């Protein structure tokens, strides 16, 4: 058991390979060839000190939704205190950091689970499980692009261990750690915009509904996606929410979708935006109904398309939040009043 977690690889090294092939496998290990890392861009990620304005350090939380929503709220209530350009720059920094952080989390998950992944049909060809990248190379690669704040780092490290039996006895599932990793930066993204104007406790309370939305949404989409592995994971007695749900998996997903929409209602009520009610709440509600009607507990592979559809929801929500910023700041009016649109 201990050999599984050794940093130094004791197995035979991969055969001869080019540097280009190694680089390709490392990028695959981080899932940079897929859409998965963009999920962290939508709702969670890391924090880092950056210099803004008059060289004041500010912590930029990787939460694009939170940053855009907080920016729209701030510019609507105190237009002289902040500019739309500043909000956009903060959002771009959040996007970049979240993307890199998620890559590190993907590597860590595969590094811990490499011996399990060898026995699961969907994951046996991943670089670490297939032996194309050694454990040492994978660990070093992860350290290269780890730049995370402490709470999220700890949660990300604990995520793969949540699949072990100790956590089962404590009724702790790995989806909880993943949900926290993506939800906590919602507060950081909020403070990246409003942290100087309001107390810390107020930032937490204002961003809490969004963080809960992201937490429950992550539980929903990860449970549906991971359900594809339920047959192999059940044989190995892997601890996970979808294994525990068993035959009641469909009802479990319905409950999670309801919790997502309930917490989203609280967030949008505070935003008081007709545009967000239409573009966010209505779109998500219709999408969830469509997803849950398509999901079939007897066909685990039906969980895969749900994950992709939620990725599309995340992209759309960035567009919706960016449009809200444009509407709140008056940028939309300026854009459409440009002479290009005049006859």
Curated annotation (Swiss-Prot):
Chief location bin: membrane
Gene that specifies this protein: spyF
Record lineage: Eukaryota, Fungi, Dikarya, Ascomycota, Pezizomycotina
S-adenosyl-L-methionine keyword on record: no
Subcellular location: Membrane
Family classification: Belongs to the UbiA prenyltransferase family.
This protein's record includes keyword Transmembrane: yes
EC number: 2.5.1.-
GO MF annotation, one: transferase activity
The protein, known as: Polyprenyl transferase spyF
Transmembrane feature ranges: 38-58, 62-82, 92-112, 138-158, 170-190, 241-261, 273-293, 311-331
GO BP term, pick one: terpenoid biosynthetic process
Disruption-associated phenotype: Accumulates triacetic acid lactone (TAL).
PANTHER family: 4-HYDROXYBENZOATE POLYPRENYLTRANSFERASE, MITOCHONDRIAL, PRENYLTRANSFERASES
Cofactor(s) required, per the database record: Mg(2+)
Function of the protein: Polyprenyl transferase; part of the gene cluster that mediates the biosynthesis of meroterpenoids called sartorypyrones. Within the pathway, spyF catalyzes the prenylation of triacetic acid lactone (TAL) to produce geranylgeranyl-triacetate lactone. The biosynthesis of sartorypyrones begins with the production of triacetic acid lactone (TAL) by the NR-PKS spyA using one molecule of acetyl-CoA and two molecules of malonyl-CoA.
Native organism: Aspergillus fumigatus (strain ATCC MYA-4609 / CBS 101355 / FGSC A1100 / Af293) (Neosartorya fumigata)
Membrane topology summary: Multi-pass membrane protein
One Gene Ontology term, aspect cellular component: plasma membrane
Pathway note: Secondary metabolite biosynthesis; terpenoid biosynthesis
Catalytic activity: triacetate lactone + (2E,6E,10E)-geranylgeranyl diphosphate = (2E,6E,10E)-geranylgeranyl-triacetate lactone + diphosphate
